[in-house]
């Protein structure tokens, strides 16, 4: 029996992703989503892959999200960026779709922790429903291969 896997692909006729090529632009995008969903702004951090994986206790993690002292944080692994200048980073094109999905994925984690603290399962059906809804809005969908 063949194992099904999926990859995210972009639809052409949907809302365009904003240009997010710096830490500030990622934070701005997440803050825009936060305003839309009535959340406080989210602080974006870039850390080592080792730090992200140790913090999240997941050997394949490239990002993580958490709440601390009523503030929300999202950390992304610096290995998914290509340094062009000390203050500027651009996404590696071959990982772009996966990174966009990771941005939405971590936002949904923050949203669920604030708006639905009673849902303890980190990847609940409600979590995936919201993630897929946001992904569809921006033209990101799953292609089963």
Predicted regions and their residues:
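Acidic, serine/threonine- and proline/glycine-rich low-complexity repeats
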Residues: 1-14
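Surface-exposed beta-strand-to-loop junctions
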Residues: 7-10, 106-110
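Short alpha-helical catalytic segment bearing the HExxH-like zincin motif
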Residues: 98-106
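Short histidine/acidic/glycine/proline-rich micro-motifs that form metal-
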Residues: 16-17, 116-118
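Active-site scaffold of zinc-dependent metalloenzymes
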Residues: 50-97, 110, 114, 121, ...
């Amino acid at each position: 029996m063949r194992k099904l896997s999926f990859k995210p692909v972009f639809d052409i006729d949907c809302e365009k992703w904003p240009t997010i090529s710096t830490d500030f632009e990622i934070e701005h995008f997440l803050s825009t989503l936060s305003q839309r969903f009535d959340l406080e702004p989210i602080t974006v951090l870039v850390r080592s892959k080792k730090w992200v994986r140790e913090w999240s206790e997941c050997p394949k993690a490239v990002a993580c999200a958490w709440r601390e002292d009523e503030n929300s944080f999202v950390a992304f692994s610096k290995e998914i960026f290509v340094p062009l200048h000390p203050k500027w980073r651009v996404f590696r094109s071959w990982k772009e779709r996966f990174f966009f999905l990771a941005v939405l994925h971590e936002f949904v984690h923050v949203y669920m922790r604030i708006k639905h603290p009673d849902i303890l399962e980190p990847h609940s059906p409600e979590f995936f429903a919201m993630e897929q809804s946001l992904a569809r809005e921006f033209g990101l969908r799953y292609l089963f291969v």
